[in-house]
Amino acid sequence: MDYVSLLNQFWQKQIKSYKETPSQYHYLYPPRFFYKPVLGNLQHPTKWCCTIKFYEYSAQATECTKASAKQDAARLICEQLQAAGLLNGMELRFRSSASDIFGQNRYDASKSYFFSKTA
C-alpha cells in the first residue's frame, strides 16, 4: 500500500464513522490533488508540483513525475495526520524484494514510511 492508498483508506474510514453520526452536516471531502508544471534542471527541464488538500491539512511536493510528486505530497500529509494522532489503527506496508509473495514484509527501522498499527 502506498501513501495515496493510505489517505483513501483513512477517508473511507472517516466517511463510515460520519454516516453513523446523526448530524446531516458532516462530510469529509476526498483528498484533492492539484498539479502545476514548474521549472526544473538540466536533467529534468520540467518538474511537477503537486498540492494536496485533505482534512484541514495541505502539503506540497515537487518531483520529476506527477506520480512521484503525488506520493511525496501524500507522505507529508500522512506525517501530519500521524503527528495529530489521526492515523491510529491504520498501517502502511510496502512489498520489498526481501519478502516473498505470500509472506509479510520485513520491518526496516531505517525507513520512515512504516506506521505502527495501534488499537
From Swiss-Prot:
One record GO biological process: symbiont-mediated perturbation of host cell cycle G0/G1 transition checkpoint
Recorded GO MF terms: RNA binding
The UniProt record lists the keyword S-adenosyl-L-methionine: no
GO CC field: host cell mitochondrion; host cell nucleolus
Family matches, as CDD domains: DSRM_SF
Cellular localisation: Host nucleus, Host nucleolus; Host mitochondrion
Residue stretches spanning the membrane: none
Domain DRBM: start-end pairs: 2-83
InterPro entries associated with the record: dsRBD_dom
SUPFAM superfamilies: dsRNA-binding domain-like
Keywords, in A-Z order: Apoptosis, G0/G1 host cell cycle checkpoint dysregulation by virus, Host mitochondrion, Host nucleus, Host-virus interaction, Modulation of host cell apoptosis by virus, Modulation of host cell cycle by virus, RNA-binding
Matching Gene3D superfamilies: 3.30.160.20
Role according to the record: Induces host cell G0/G1 arrest and apoptosis.
Subunit text: Interacts with host RUNX1 isoform b.
Record's protein name: Non-structural protein 3b
Source species of the chain: Bat coronavirus HKU4
